């Protein structure tokens, strides 16, 4: 088995009030738009209860779109798309007090593309 670790940490925003956290990472059954700190697996499977809470063990999703976004300034967002064919766990850390975003990706394979989209 091959593991790929990718860790990205955004610098804190100027004010914590503009920080909302990371959103995205697949088709989510959660009522929350922004992800809580926790683990979020991406692996297509037909599950009877896809509701997620970010607690271990992570729940698999019905459909996967490994794209996430976070706000890094008042009117600026960063989007990241991971084009991977392997099962992947995303470890999310949203620090609402400091306005810092942390995400770590652990994939079971080593080949893929990563696209970063920046807004002005």
Task: State each model region's role.
Residues 1-120:
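Catalytic and substrate-binding clefts that recognize carbohydrates or anionic sugar/phosphate headgroups
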């Amino acid at each position: 088995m091959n593991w790929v670790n990718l860790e990205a940490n955004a610098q804190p925003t100027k004010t914590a009030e503009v920080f909302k956290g990371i959103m995205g990472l697949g088709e989510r059954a959660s009522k929350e738009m922004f992800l809580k700190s926790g683990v979020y697996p991406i692996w297509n499977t037909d599950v009877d209860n896809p509701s997620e809470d970010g607690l271990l063990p992570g729940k698999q999703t019905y459909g996967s779109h490994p794209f996430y976004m976070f706000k890094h300034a008042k009117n600026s967002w960063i989007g990241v798309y991971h084009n991977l064919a392997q099962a992947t766990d995303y470890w999310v850390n949203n620090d609402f007090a400091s306005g810092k975003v942390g995400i770590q990706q652990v994939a079971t394979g080593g080949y893929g593309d990563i696209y970063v989209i920046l807004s002005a």
